[in-house]
Amino acid sequence: MAVTKTHPIKSTLKAAIDYICNPEKTDGKLLVSSYGCAAETADIEFSWTRRHAIDKGTNLGRHLIQAFQPGEVTPEQAHEIGMELAKEILGGKYEFVLTTHIDKDHVHNHLIFNAVSFADHKHYHSNKRSYHDIRRTSDRLCKEHGLSVIIPGQDKGKSYIEHQAMQNGTSSVSYTHLRAHETL
């Protein structure tokens, strides 16, 4: 199961790339990949592409996070899925840096990509449709790799605290579910 979220990078591209490439989080940079640029100079290369853009937009790049359920995926498998996701959603038209972080209890990918295509110099349009395409693609790739997928609406109506308690098995609802299954 992977959860995805995305946000724009408006002014701190180099800092964001430096953060995701941190060797302490990426197994000594073994879990760092890039496309169309070098991770070490990606901010400069993104800027060069942006200078040639027809429609620059206001964003320097986009930051996508893909987080996996604890214990469900190896760092290498997560990185492979992240690379497949990046290539599919960006269609080989945008420079990107992909890293896999292993510093938390869950493995997660960070993908920073240029807001301008090096192929046609057009601006990436982020909206609900593009986000849902990212999520659908991520879910499909997770299924193809034998991972679980979040069922839409599964957690609808639960507060954050109830969701966390369910995850930890400490909520009254999870206790009731457990007792019901034990009696069957």
Regions found by a protein language model. Name each.
Residues 1-179:
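N-terminal nicking endonuclease/strand-transfer module with a His-rich metal-binding environment
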Residues 180-184:
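A short, hydrophobic C-terminal helix/tail in secreted or cell-surface proteins
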